[in-house]
A protein has these predicted regions:
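Structural preference for solvent-exposed beta-strand-turn elements
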Residues: 1-274
Length: 274
């Protein structure tokens, strides 16, 4: 899985990469003199292509190596054994007729809003994901790392069994499709969520387990409620938490109906007040 699987056939090139939690496929048209397939170290190949000057790049199969040429640059990379690549990753594991069209803007915007509260990789697995809580025509997206909670409700999501999906994988999917102004297709199976169009495809593994009862975390009544200017509160938080590191708590104190005091204290460094 450290390699990129490259397959060339009839003027089309397909590139596949995966870490098992996420599968990404990209298709592009090429001028091919001969078809074939190979597996090349993903990190090195990506770095080589990124550093090459813009323009035409030529790939040649030399048996145990792949030669890459562009302008005055030439690289020869040793191939990995493509026969060891998992066959399941080379084929689509869903029935295309069950796919639904999706205008991605609303979904992707909502995912980015709630994703900031998801636990980072390495934390409790279920909390690294976004929970799709369906209720009729509305779907509430939920994420929490147990310190904070974010929700956002969208309408008309064409599937109702998305479950819990890793935010890291969803964020990579957003990056892939965010520049497209056209609808994409979405397909949900028992274990995976699939997104695709004519050029790109991603398969995101669903997380197993039960998501926390997030609705119980909302208070039945508010001790106080304040309305603030978004830009001002973000700038104030940024200034007052310069000395905060990790999970140093931030204290919010309502001084009166017109003033809010924001402070943080780090016993090793100092403190800040806004």
């Amino acid at each position: 899985l450290q390699g990129l699987y490259i397959k060339v056939e009839d003027g089309s090139c397909e590139v596949i990469g995966s870490d098992l939690d996420l599968v990404i496929k990209a298709k592009l048209n090429v001028d091919s003199m001969v078809g074939g397939e190979c597996l090349v170290n993903a990190r090195i190949l990506s770095e080589v292509v990124r550093k090459m000057s813009s323009g035409e790049i030529v790939f040649s199969d030399l048996g145990n190596e792949v030669m890459i040429e562009a302008d005055k640059s030439e690289y020869k990379l040793r191939k990995l054994d493509h026969l060891t690549y998992p066959k399941a990753l080379l084929e689509n594991s869903f029935e295309q007729e069950n796919s639904q069209k999706l205008a991605p803007f609303e979904l992707f915007t909502a995912l980015r809003k709630v994703g900031i509260a998801a636990s980072p990789e390495g934390g409790k697995p279920i909390l690294t994901g976004v929970f799709f809580d369906n209720d009729g025509e509305k779907t509430t997206l939920v994420s929490t790392d147990s310190y904070r909670l974010a929700t956002n409700t969208i309408s008309n999501l064409p599937i109702d069994d998305a479950g819990i999906v890793s935010y890291r994988s969803l964020n990579e999917t957003i990056k892939l499709f965010e520049d497209s102004e056209q609808d994409i297709f979405i397909n949900s199976t028992e274990r995976e969520l699939h997104f695709y169009n004519e050029k790109y495809y991603t398969s995101v593994r669903k997380l197993e387990g039960n998501y926390p009862e997030y609705q119980a975390l909302f208070p039945k009544e508010n001790v106080f409620s304040i309305e603030v200017d978004k830009k001002k509160i973000l700038e104030s938080l940024d200034r007052s938490t310069v000395v905060a590191e990790g999970f140093i708590p931030v204290t919010l104190k309502v001084v009166d109906e017109n003033n809010l005091n924001i402070s943080s204290t780090n016993k090793d460094i100092g403190g800040g007040v806004e």
